[in-house]
Amino acid sequence: RRHTRSLCDWSSDVCSSDLEVGHLKYGRQLHFWDFKERKPIETMYLGEDGLVPLEVKFHHNPDSTHGFCGAALSANVIHWWKDKDGKWQWEKIIDVENQPHPDWPIPIPGVMSAILVSMDDKYLYLNNWLHGDMRQYDISDPHKPKLTGQVWMGGLLGRAPKVNGLEIAGGPQMFQLSLDGKRLYVTTSLFSTWDNQFYPNIREKGGVMIMIDCDPVNGGMKINPDFIVNFGEEPNGPSRCHESRYPGGDCTSDIWL
């Protein structure tokens, strides 16, 4: 309705090489385009708060100018909006701290490779692929998010090496939420090069999909104990799982009408 599209410039060769945490060769800008006129209108430089800006999500409400970006390497969520003067503004609203690890020379970044906004624009979900946790934030006030849920699966911190009896080689990566906001499906593979770099056992074990039960009214998350898909046992496997979609629509493909 507002004919605006947002794009990020996370890197030129990031998919084909190892993730070099100490390098500064990655993108840190957001670009806004007038989709009707097909021309760029704004570029936001995010600096160190926006290293490897990856997923961008607007509110589903087409009258809203609010949107969010997950900066993967900084492990931050950037919030943007248009002010009363029609100018685009941005701020960092979530900052996931790096965590120490005995085998790493530097603290481990979360690597926030995905974000998602619920259909009612009430909750924002994010992952920390290297830490191993999924989070739910109430964004009723998009300037002041509140953490309302957190679960652990895999990751390098050792908080949940097994889920529903299955050892996880990887961490929470892509995820998809049902339109009613109650079922969140999470998979574990990012890119094969990064998978092999940080989770080499995924070559033999394959990927996993779990389901998280979400409370869309009061907030909260818990791993469903009766659901798990082991892609390591697929024919001609082990296989890896990246992204999922709902045939009847989901919170990524649908908007308000």
Regions found by a protein language model. Give the residues of each.
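Surface-exposed loop and turn segments in beta-propeller and other repeat-based domains
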Residues: 40-51, 88-108, 148-167, 224-257
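Short loop/turn segments immediately following beta-strands, especially the blade-tip
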Residues: 32-39, 79-93, 136-148, 199-201, ...
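Single conserved hydrophobic/aromatic residue that forms the stacking wall/gate
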Residues: 2-15, 113
